[in-house]
Amino acid sequence: MDKYDKNVPSDYDGLFQKAADANGVSYDLLRKVAWTESRFVPTAKSKTGPLGMMQFTKATAKALGLRVTDGPDDDRLNPELAINAAAKQLAGLVGKFDGDELKAALAYNQGEGRLGNPQLEAYSKGDFASISEEGRNYMRNLLDVAKSPMAGQLETFGGITPKGKGIPAEVGLAGIGHKQKVTQELPESTSFDVKGIEQEATAKPFAKDFWETHGETLDEYNSRSTFFGFKNAAEAELSNSVAGMAFRAGRLDNGFDVFKDTITPTRWNSHIWTPEELEKIRTEVKNPAYINVVTGGSPENLDDLIKLANENFENDSRAAEAGLGAKLSAGIIGAGVDPLSYVPMVGVTGKGFKLINKALVVGAESAALNVASEGLRTSVAGGDADYAGAALGGFVFGAGMSAISDAVAAGLKRSKPEAEFDNEFIGPMMRLEARETARNANSADLSRMNTENMKFEGEHNGVPYEDLPTERGAVVLHDGSVLSASNPINPKTLKEFSEVDPEKAARGIKLAGFTEIGLKTLGSDDADIRRVAIDLVRSPTGMQSGASGKFGATASDIHERLHGTDQRTYNDLYKAMSDAMKDPEFSTGGAKMSREETRYTIYRRAALAIERPELQKALTPSERIVMDIIKRHFDTKRELMENPAIFGNTKAVSIFPESRHKGTYVPHVYDRHAKALMIQRYGAEGLQEGIARSWMNSYVSRPEVKARVDEMLKELHGVKEVTPEMVEKYAMDKAYGISHSDQFTNSSIIEENIEGLVGIENNSFLEARNLFDSDLSITMPDGQQFSVNDLRDFDMFRIMPAYDRRVNGDIAIMGSTGKTTKELKDEILALKAKAEGDGKKTGEVHALMDTVKILTGRARRNQDTVWETSLRAINDLGFFAKNAYMGAQNITEIAGMIVTGNVRALGHGIPILRDTLYKSKPVSAKELKELHASLFGKEVDQLIRPKRADIVQRLREATDTGPAVANIVGTLKYSTQELAARSPWTKLLNGTTNYLLDAARQGMLGDVISATLTGKTTRWEKEGFLRGASVTPEQMAGIKSLIKEHMVRGEDGKFTVKDKQAFSMDPRAMDLWRLADKVADEAMLRPHKVSLQDSHAFGALGKMVMQFKSFTIKSLNSKFLRTFYDGYKNNRAIDAALSIITSMGLAGGFYAMAAHVKAYALPKEKRKEYLERALDPTMIAHAALSRSSQLGAPLAMVDLVGGVLGFESSKMARSTILPKDTVKERDPNKPYTSREVMGAMGSNLLEQMPSAGFVANVGATLMNAAGVVNSPNKATEQDFMTGLMNSTKELVPNDPLTQQLVLKIYEANGVNLRERRK
């Protein structure tokens, strides 16, 4: 397009509109500036250096926050980023020049430095001749879109108005019959009615106006020295200082009273001025800014005060004409005479504070005190405070005093050469001078450094920095700015301080062993314990500052993220395996093999195809999908081990051992039974030799195997040639670990038990890697064919979870701490030794040890005995019978979502609804769901469960249980486990949990992505919320950059992530994950998180006692106190209040609805009476308070005790207790017996412990059944049948349908459910 036409669309009009709206600049101006600069070509490059559509220089681009690489990833080549930056720059210039868009455009084109600044000054004077021809043409080209008071003058400058378009001959000779048209061009030739442009009145020449104002010419003014007016400036500083005012007032007759009046603040003056006095003050005080000299005084001194005020004004007016050097010198004098300059601000404390260097203590103190003095001076002498000048003067004064002391030090050094005297002030002073010059001259800040070759390896709270080698403690930031060591925002200083004294958790409720690991460790009084814990966990109460802990990824964060994505992978694999098993090879004809054998066969084919890629062509399409999922999973784990820094910690290094077969690795786990059979046949030494021979066969026959083994052995032995003996020894050593130990068998990877932390750093999966191939067969002594693969276990539903449990821990620890598991273990063991003899600290260190066990997939307790396994089976049955209402009850947890308005994504499971809700958004609901799945995976899942053989094997190997008992108890536990896991009510519980958490996170993702793409901000970017999530503003900006860089617009106008794997592996994605995790925490309590685990690992009996109560205990800190702390620490009091009110409404509403549903479990005749009791307003209020997710935890704890003591209101609020008939009132005059009290309390206790109650009801069922069989008459039989019905109801799910079914069965068998007549 050779000529600009605003009616011709471009591909970037949407970006222009979005950037213009976001930055408050004219769309037409921004668009035409882009056309003028580059003709809308994103890759345009000027010969002089500017690049991209908006033609940014390197310096300008960096100043605007763009990445400059001169490569294809240079942000100047990104139209969206460049246009937004240009809009931001134009908006700033327009505001700076009071809305003059032409002047802003000139500054954009010519800059504001050495070349541009004179042109801008000429523009202000109307001297267009002094503006370059390029600048004038640039402005003229924008006259039709730029608003400016100088537009008319520019248009007439240089002659007549610019010419119109040439007139074709056929138009010129067309005559008056030619059809005219309305255009934006000049009038056509068929009309001669040309009107000129009305011009403004002739302006007074600037030189004349300047002479009249200043009494000197421009040349005289410009030739002034920088120290011009020093005398006037110094007099003003001295006269108007506090000391000067005191001296001048003292010369008056009533001097003390006058000075007292000048220093008295207006608000403290009790005198009420009369109308006459007020009028006198208004008319006689020359400048209103100096009126405070008078208004603090008394009427007796009014004339003297007015005189002082006017003298102060005249002094300051003369000083205002002085040059910069004169003002600075006068400021130094002012600082010198001010008493506050000599206040020892830091004093003794600062001398021992290692983070503060001497020079900036002196300079910064003087600057700060001089600013305070400036405020005091203007309150006494009147006028406008010049805080910048005061700070500069004070700084230089402090520096000067420091220089004097340095001169003394230099003299001392000559006499004592061994002494060290450093002057560290020169660097900060030079930067200060450069910044002040840039500010005053509107030029580039020369104190900023070139950052192109800097690595920025340091980081604190999301702010990367590079050490400045020439100045101790100083750092360079990404934008090139340098921060001194004592700068309060220096990230290195802040990091060192946090390491010296890590922040402590906010006060919480500690309940011995039930105290959360996060609170116990981060709430420690020992700074060393907190220093370790801050990288591992988060406190449920948050920290004392209101943050949730580390402003970066903790080990628990990484562990939970990996666990979620692993669960998604397992579900994908399960579905792919189900599809593969439907292949005709397995699904047609006679039954060739069981489902288990079919699954194992497919797994084996997929694993071998990964290890030998040439086998992939033999796979069916469905088997290929299975293989791809497995391969992608192990490849991703390898990438994470190689680069754990993707979680945001630049100190994290690779923990992956060198491997010569990347991309073809599947963990080698050996089947215990297959190995035992081989040892029985060949002996351990025979099996070792067979394994080694099989491996040697691959070494001899496959060049790639030989090459990688030789390479490794050369490095290992430091030789140039590898001998056959070296290879054979390596093969035999590796084979010994398989044939002579259980280290790498399938039983050893199910769950490891270790004492303390001994050996916790050992990772058998990484140690088991070898460089041979295991698929080649050899002939054994008995003539049988054997390959190492014959010993392997290929069941991926056993191998993958075990591999992930172990590897995820090492990744999480390195990714958060920058340390290996061994280094962390050694640090914790040192803390343990230090805490010896202190029970409280020892308990906190043990909590740290347990945290590491959880992260690395180790058991915190010894293996369950037969007794404990039986108790866990009973717990399963109690859960099966009492969890019907819990899935629906999850809805009462979402008060936080409702209050923040984060409800749009609640329809994400209904395609039509979700698409409708996101129809107007730049990203579709389907894309959000896929992005969420790639980043967060699946939160709660029970797909991976121990098999019956695993449980039996564990009992036999880890306890002294015989085979028969192990089989019985193992089968029982497996059966109850499957019963509880497959229950529809369990699936509803897990399903609603995942659905609501996904909705909360997807809603936040949608908001942030939409706001980023449209240039807006969201509720999630508020300071209080970000602090509560431990996300810095810089990290939030990084999240936005991540979104912009990875999202592209499709043909349908919707944005999508072009590579979700790359998106999720970007370090900034971890900050996005943490932000969404905070949203999920506010949506629902998640007791399965690492930080919320009990600090003591309770056994099966403890779990039985606390079944269904752990949620209430965790709510005390995570919901009740955290809501309170968020309210007042993070300025979210309104959110906290609304969430409490909303949660009470949800709890009360759910209780009322649940009461109606529960009533259906009763006989029809008894429902009305039950509902009258349950729906009593007092009961509803009690339930609303006690079951509120935000406020209810304390009262719910009281209800736990109240239920045991028999209070009906405490029982009715619990969903695990079935509705009962009306209890007959006890005669109040009848004495109590111990049997009666213990019997009632025992019954109540069993109701509060569902698992124990289940056992009691099994016993009652058996005894009632025996009573029915042996009853002597019909009436007795009916009584036993009624008892049998009541005990049976407690053994089945507590949903109303099942309960009603039980009632109908017994009613059909003769049980009379109606009340007997009295």
Swiss-Prot record:
Q: Which GO terms describe its biological process?
A: defense response to bacterium; killing of cells of another organism; peptidoglycan metabolic process; symbiont entry into host; symbiont entry into host cell via disruption of host cell envelope; symbiont entry into host cell via disruption of host cell wall peptidoglycan; symbiont genome ejection through host cell envelope; symbiont genome ejection through host cell envelope, short tail mechanism
- Enumerate the Periplasmic topological stretches: 1-1136
Under InterPro entries, the record lists: Gp16, Lysozyme-like_dom_sf, Transglyc_AS, Transglycosylase_SLT_dom_1
Residue span of region Transglycosylase SLT-type domain = 24-111
**Region Essential for viral DNA translocation: which residues?**
1314-1318
Which PANTHER family is this protein grouped with? MEMBRANE-BOUND LYTIC MUREIN TRANSGLYCOSYLASE C (PTHR37423:SF2), SOLUBLE LYTIC MUREIN TRANSGLYCOSYLASE-RELATED (PTHR37423)
Q: What does this protein do?
A: Component of the cylindrical core that assembles on the inner surface of the capsid during capsid formation and plays a role in viral DNA ejection into the host cell. The inner core is composed of stacked rings of gp14, gp15 and gp16 proteins. Following binding to the host cell surface, the internal core is diassembled and gp16 is ejected along with gp14 and gp15 into the infected cell. Gp16 probably inserts in the host inner membrane and remains associated with gp15.
Coiled coil regions in record: none
A cellular component term from Gene Ontology for this protein is:
host cell plasma membrane
Catalytic reaction(s) noted: Exolytic cleavage of the (1->4)-beta-glycosidic linkage between N-acetylmuramic acid (MurNAc) and N-acetylglucosamine (GlcNAc) residues in peptidoglycan, from either the reducing or the non-reducing ends of the peptidoglycan chains, with concomitant formation of a 1,6-anhydrobond in the MurNAc residue
Domain-related comment? The N-terminus contains the transglycosylase activity (Potential). The C-terminus is essential for the viral DNA translocation into the host cytoplasm.
Task: Locate the active site.
Answer: E37
Q: What class of enzyme is it?
A: lyase
Could you tell me what this protein is called?
Peptidoglycan transglycosylase gp16
Cytoplasmic side residue ranges read 1158-1318
Its transmembrane ranges are 1137-1157
Please indicate which superkingdom the organism of origin belongs to. Viruses
Known EC number: 4.2.2.n1
